[in-house]
Amino acid sequence: MRGCYTALITPMNRDGSLDFEGLHDLLEYQSENEVAGIVAMGTTGESPTLDWKEHMSVVSKTNIFCGADLHVIAGTGANNTKESEEGTREAIDLGVKTILLVDPYYNGPSSLEIRREYYEPLAREFPGANFIPYIIPGRTGTMLLPEDLALLSEHCPNIIGVKEATGDFSNMRAIRRLCRENFPILSGDDEKTLAMMADPTILASGTISVVANILPWTMREMVNAQLDNDPETAKQLAAGLMPLMGIVTVKTEEDTPRGRVMCKARNPLATKTLMNILGMPAGPCRQPLGKMTMGGMVKVIEAARQVYATRPDFFEPIEEFFDVDVGERLHDKTNWEGLCYDSY
């Protein structure tokens, strides 16, 4: 597991139905930009708000559209091992060979339980499939600890890596220290990817990226430069990308009739908002996700403008593939209509 994998959004029509034509276009765009692979139905793909039939239709079409060109990884994690088993079986039957399993959320199992009652049963039930645990305690409220990940990878050789999204570098270092030699660590946080790869006590081998939905070529080049021992190029690309990496989640303070509050627009809301502005297939998010505030959307636009002003070449693949003028779209307010709430 090396390189840049895109945590793909799920494009939707205005009525909230799945946009498979848009999905095909996005996958073709990713393929042309030579990413290492695609994660279908992760957090960015809005897996919590798609029913299993929709979930599997996205996995199926992604696998068909990608063919042999891209490594497809299907998210089938749940907080119910039986449900995850059924989803995993269906994904494997559709031809997917690699599965992303998020730690069980909400019901709060211990790390021991996560290992013994979730990851190990699933990995053993499907010995011909590869599994990647996805550790993101900010979403799940629990986490597989490095010690249990090390035991898991020893007991189950089809655990082929980890998506690490704790934001905790000491946790990442513990994974590297405890797990088998060359065990792949993939960044789950765009802002931290280069630091994770460059740190000799972590040595991440790539990323599962949100920003790659928009700028797959540049994210790929950054990751590959670091893998190819060209840290200066990697740093230059990361510096150019940083404003967009900073808007995967957008925080704003908002005035309400009852006082001032903090508003946090979480992934994929900001990413889909920007993709809509740029003229890429994205559409709305599924409820209970909704829209950004005006202040949040302005932050997104300003970040994109900043990147465009310093590195317009980053956006050339979008302009060529989707036949759009990025500079015009980032300054024409008609492209933003309806993408944010009118008031709090």
Task: List each language-model region with its residue ranges.
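A general structural signal for well-ordered alpha-helical segments in protein cores
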Residues: 23, 59, 84, 119, ...
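Catalytic alpha/beta core domains of metabolic enzymes, predominantly
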Residues: 121-129, 136-253, 263
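Active-site beta->alpha loop and helix N-cap motifs at the rims of alpha/beta catalytic domains
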Residues: 1-143, 290, 314-344
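Structured C-terminal cap/extension of enzyme domains
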Residues: 197-344
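A generic alpha-helix structural signal
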Residues: 27, 59, 88, 176, ...
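Short alpha-helical interface patches
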Residues: 51-57, 151, 297-305
